């Protein structure tokens, strides 16, 4: 950091409270933060030093980096290993047995690294991760230059990474202490789900998060079976159960939230619980379709997650949001729901608010971190442009992302990572696949 530069574009989408779009806009970055925003001609008048680099051009769109609010990055190494199965069978017969055999810091580091480069190249600058061996996740993210909210997975049973709930919580506490002041890594506590965590474990997770002012990340009501089990075991639906035991406090991102009734949605809105909508994973596993339009109407902050690439099978938020918008229009028979501006908010500022980092990222405003994405609009499938939001949400592809900045550092230039050998990461993935395939 310490570098000053200008980024210009034909369209600058601020995602501020006024949803301002500046045509022929530009911004100035200094010491990793946005120093100034305005029209390109005015910016050039104010910053006349010819040595200041200028990125972008007159045929691009500049926007805040996308935020993936639910994923398991390292699971990219299980991409395509088991498809076309219901969630429970997919987990118990394929994913969990493979994790038991291969889960290690090396596996997590290599998988996370591959996921990070996939996310960066598709415009994601921050991801909210729930997994194990958090040190390996953090090191991979920092090496790749991406921002990450890293949640230590918490379960009641042992895995290759821990002996049980108290062990996972101790690891979470240690990780929080180490990374609480890091510029790229935000620690979190991630109790896996109601069906894998006891009441005591859920409450201990919440207390640890509240004490350290870090986010909570949990799977919630992903399948109807999960709701039935909660009713059977606890006498209440999942959201009502969590409210009843006193869990719903702090900054919570609830992944999936597919099977919520109206009362549960009201509770989510009341308690300011963020929802990470993972439409592709939910569709592929036949888990159901979350009532996103209804949630948004009732004031729930909904953002987008990809889930892990093992169930998606990619980490492309542009694809995710386009499908989400169309599915909601279809199931509600209302073409006005999830309009293109709402969709952009779900990728950016609403996601930041869900994670409690809206003062730092999520919009292009002075003082915020320079997490930025430049999209090349000079493509046949992106022209003509009448509404830039529409072009991005309904027409753009991950491959249209050309340049990506994180924390004021140019990480992706012309679609290539600037300081990592992509081929090396691909070769490692192939090596892991051979081991897993032959096991």
Curated annotation (Swiss-Prot):
Gene3D superfamilies: Metal-dependent hydrolases, Urease, subunit C, domain 1. SUPFAM superfamilies: Composite domain of metallo-dependent hydrolases (SSF51338), Metallo-dependent hydrolases (SSF51556). Its EC number is 3.5.4.28, 3.5.4.31. One of its GO terms (molecular function) is S-adenosylhomocysteine deaminase activity. Transmembrane segments: none annotated. Substrate binds at residues 99, 192, 222, 307. Keywords: Hydrolase, Metal-binding, Zinc. It is an enzyme of class 3 (hydrolase). This is 5-methylthioadenosine/S-adenosylhomocysteine deaminase. Its cofactor is Zn(2+). Zn(2+) binds at residues 70, 72, 219, 307. Catalyzes the deamination of 5-methylthioadenosine and S-adenosyl-L-homocysteine into 5-methylthioinosine and S-inosyl-L-homocysteine, respectively. Is also able to deaminate adenosine. Binds 1 zinc ion per subunit. Belongs to the metallo-dependent hydrolases superfamily. MTA/SAH deaminase family. It catalyses: S-adenosyl-L-homocysteine + H2O + H(+) = S-inosyl-L-homocysteine + NH4(+); S-methyl-5'-thioadenosine + H2O + H(+) = S-methyl-5'-thioinosine + NH4(+).
């Amino acid at each position: 950091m310490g570098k000053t530069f200008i980024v210009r574009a034909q369209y600058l989408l601020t995602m501020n409270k006024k949803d301002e779009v500046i045509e022929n806009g530009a911004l100035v970055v200094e010491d990793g933060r946005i120093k100034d925003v305005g029209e390109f001609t005015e910016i050039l008048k104010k910053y006349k030093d010819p040595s200041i680099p200028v990125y972008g051009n007159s045929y691009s769109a500049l926007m805040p980096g996308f935020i993936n609010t639910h994923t398991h990055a390292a699971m990219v190494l299980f991409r395509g290993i088991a498809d076309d199965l219901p969630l429970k069978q997919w987990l118990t017969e394929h994913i969990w047995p493979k994790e038991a055999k291969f889960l290690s810091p090396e596996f997590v580091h290599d998988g996370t690294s591959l996921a990070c480069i996939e996310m960066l190249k598709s415009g994601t600058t921050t991801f909210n991760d729930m997994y194990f061996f958090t040190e390996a996740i953090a090191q991979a993210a920092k090496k790749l230059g991406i921002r990450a909210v890293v949640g230590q997975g918490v379960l009641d049973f042992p895995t290759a990474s821990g002996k049980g709930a108290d062990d996972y919580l101790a690891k979470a506490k240690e990780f929080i202490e180490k990374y609480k002041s890091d510029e790229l890594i935000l620690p979190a506590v991630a109790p896996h789900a109601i069906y894998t965590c006891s009441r005591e474990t859920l409450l201990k997770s919440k207390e640890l998060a509240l004490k350290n002012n870090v986010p909570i990340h949990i799977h919630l009501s992903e399948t109807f079976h999960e709701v039935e089990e909660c009713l059977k075991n606890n006498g209440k639906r999942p959201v009502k159960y969590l409210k009843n035991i006193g869990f719903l406090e702090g900054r919570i991102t609830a992944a999936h939230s597919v099977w919520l009734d109206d009362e549960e949605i009201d509770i989510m809105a009341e308690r300011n619980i963020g929802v990470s909508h993972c439409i592709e994973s939910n569709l592929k596993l036949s888990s159901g379709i979350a009532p996103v339009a209804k949630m948004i109407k009732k004031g729930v902050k909904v953002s987008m997650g990809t889930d892990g690439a093992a169930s998606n099978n990619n980490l492309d938020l542009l694809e995710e949001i386009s499908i989400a918008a169309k599915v909601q229009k279809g199931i509600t028979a209302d073409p006005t729901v999830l309009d293109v501006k709402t969709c952009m908010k779900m990728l950016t500022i609403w996601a930041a608010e869900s994670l409690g980092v809206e003062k730092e990222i999520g919009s292009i405003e002075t003082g915020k971190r320079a997490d930025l994405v430049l999209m090349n609009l000079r493509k046949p499938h992106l022209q003509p442009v009448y509404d830039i939001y529409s072009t991005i949400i309904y027409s753009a592809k991950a491959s249209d992302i050309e340049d990506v900045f994180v924390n004021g550092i140019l990480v992706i230039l012309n679609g290539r990572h600037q300081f990592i050998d992509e081929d090396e990461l691909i070769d490692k993935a192939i090596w892991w696949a051979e081991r897993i395939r032959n096991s």
